[in-house]
Amino acid sequence: MEINFKVLSKPIRGSFPSFSPKVSSGASRNKICFPSQHSTGLKFGSQERSWDISSTPKSRVRKDERMKHSSAISAVLTDDNSTMAPLEEDVKTENIGLLNLDPTLEPYLDHFRHRMKRYVDQKMLIEKYEGPLEEFAQGYLKFGFNREDGCIVYREWAPAAQEDEVIGDFNGWNGSNHMMEKDQFGVWSIRIPDVDSKPVIPHNSRVKFRFKHGNGVWVDRIPAWIKYATADATKFAAPYDGVYWDPPPSERYHFKYPRPPKPRAPRIYEAHVGMSSSEPRVNSYREFADDVLPRIKANNYNTVQLMAIMEHSYYGSFGYHVTNFFAVSSRYGNPEDLKYLIDKAHSLGLQVLVDVVHSHASNNVTDGLNGFDIGQGSQESYFHAGERGYHKLWDSRLFNYANWEVLRFLLSNLRWWLEEYNFDGFRFDGITSMLYVHHGINMGFTGNYNEYFSEATDVDAVVYLMLANNLIHKIFPDATVIAEDVSGMPGLGRPVSEGGIGFDYRLAMAIPDKWIDYLKNKNDEDWSMKEVTSSLTNRRYTEKCIAYAESHDQSIVGDKTIAFLLMDKEMYSGMSCLTDASPVVDRGIALHKMIHFFTMALGGEGYLNFMGNEFGHPEWIDFPREGNNWSYDKCRRQWNLADSEHLRYKFMNAFDRAMNSLDEKFSFLASGKQIVSSMDDDNKVVVFERGDLVFVFNFHPKNTYEGYKVGCDLPGKYRVALDSDAWEFGGHGRTGHDVDHFTSPEGIPGVPETNFNGRQIPSKCCLLREHVWLITELMNACQKLKITRQTFVVSYYQQPISRRVTRNLKIRYLQISVTLTNACQKLKFTRQTFLVSYYQQPILRRVTRKLKDSLSTNIST
């Protein structure tokens, strides 16, 4: 079958350059075949390079024979007029495996070679002077407060300071007896011996770092590596203080449960601990663990993504203006409480990711990292000097990723969260700001490759992200690392070894924009199935995506959730099950289910939902602030709405649970098979296959179709596996579930095109049908193909592995008899377990030879 590809004439804002298919027509259906994992992309933009690699500044490491592994090593940047050393010839083209996947990147080979060389050189320098990257990323064992040989040792990098001392409750905030010494790398240190075998600084006591400016002014700052910071809750807008956290063994939390296995496809529940209470107050880590985690598990999510964990002095920043990078947010509890939460999640089989903000830092001076910037140059600061060090839209500071101590600080920060708290991975926030020197400000990315690989690329930041992903996966190979990038930079989600940046997943950020646009600006009759489907499939298929219809971004004040866009004020009065649903509520609930399921099923290789949106939480999020009289009323989750038996919120919650259960059962998100067979703008119907499931969506506001035939790839018998119109999901029960549907061959002779009679497809409804596997003359097929049954199964389910198993052969030998489902029901286990036990015998003794023989011979005509 001929496959034609095209580039969207008007790329979606923020969308990924993609392999965008054109439909090729057949006699009985249209079928879209997406490129396989090893397919290449299309050419975007000009082939000419418009950048000069020699303009990128490089870093030089100051060498000294007295350098020791335990000492701090400071990187000194050259000025912006410095030139880059010539590229060495040993960086070969074949080392950039990314170009083999996408040959249209070939014109940018020099760029990839340059950044790969920078990455290799930086890593080699670290290993030369500090040891392996994993040891370099243990800076928290040296910097900040640590116990060493009967002493408390405190170290701080502050090369521009003139004099330093440590102050706190332990010395009455008078540091004259605790002055610090500075080494040649700008690291200040002090050793405070124990007195009577007890630490001089008590556990849970306040501490700060006091230093003198070059102009003679003394200032107090929270230590950069502090592990806990608190503010006086009895005072309004009280400043934060660092806290020395070293609990005795009896007060430490000890993890009891191992990390759960990495899921084949993450189904992520994005959550904010503080606003997770049903009451208008700040919730705690332990309350979240005991009350909210069971809800997440009950809805069959396998991953929790926690926002706002790193300490941030301004609650309303949603946690994205971090002040203390190694400290847990004290609003919700202390470090041991967070460990309890993570351990509880692991006991439920849930992975836990943390939002990590390394793209910028809070502009706060008294309680943030910005307080260490006293006007010095980039060589002596965590941030770029001058205008380059400020993000004018976010009002925040920007890291200098070429600085040695910045690399130590940020890489150590990642290892700290992984090892101290047992997190299972990260979501890197706002990395578009990191990838480009313009930070994405006033940029509308169109997909032209010149936008990604030019002098606008911040290679220092790219190298840091490559180092970060290399480190994370070395420490914890099963970590899940997700990138939030609106630009769609190619290679972001490919391994570092291929020349990529190394993330496991990227967020599909264009999808929610499309839904919001449709809900705000288009009537139901004007929805384009082709346009919506293109938005969901417009991605690089060699890089995995996390799809979502809405996240916390769509929930904040000034915006509206999908449920609120659909039902608005009727959510206050029309959600009772004791009265008939109004047309607005009926439409709203139906489309809420369809939009989220459509996004999940077709939009990526993982799925994300923000806390409360699964049941259509009304209204918006508004953190306490002066403008709302510091109210917490809109900064909570009303779980009682989903729990109430007489409110319609329960229907959306039940459907969300069923969506996730479906992937748990069939693993369609992890399937490489994705075929869109129909995008009917007139009838408002979309039909596609994911794995061995057939999805049918009818977005028409009125039309119900009788005897509607849809295309499918596999012949045989199908039955309904999920129906959004079912009574238990608040629907009208217009589709029967007790009827099996058999395919019938249609189309061009010799081409195995099949259809099954969909009988009825109600309006505003989505149906999912599963293929009922039948055990046929599989042995005969294997004998004719001269392959083993195991080879046949592998080649069939993970196509294409064996080219001998052609589609025609599969169709011919899978005209089947006894249903696998019936067999599983008799044996009382899942189909996957049956396949494993049947084809790799003997694994389960319950599957006896007699039973297998009876199944194989029970052939129905």
Swiss-Prot record:
Keyword 4Fe-4S belongs to the record: no
Predominant place of localization: plastid
Primary enzyme class: transferase
Gene3D superfamilies, per the entry: Glycosidases, Golgi alpha-mannosidase II, Immunoglobulins
GO biological process terms, semicolon-separated: carbohydrate metabolic process; glycogen biosynthetic process; starch biosynthetic process
Keywords: Amyloplast, Chloroplast, Glycosyltransferase, Plastid, Starch biosynthesis, Transferase
Compartments reported by the entry: Plastid, Chloroplast; Plastid, Amyloplast
Highest taxon of the lineage: Eukaryota
Quaternary structure and interacting proteins, as annotated: Monomer.
Listed name of the protein: 1,4-alpha-glucan-branching enzyme
Gene name linked to the record: SBE1
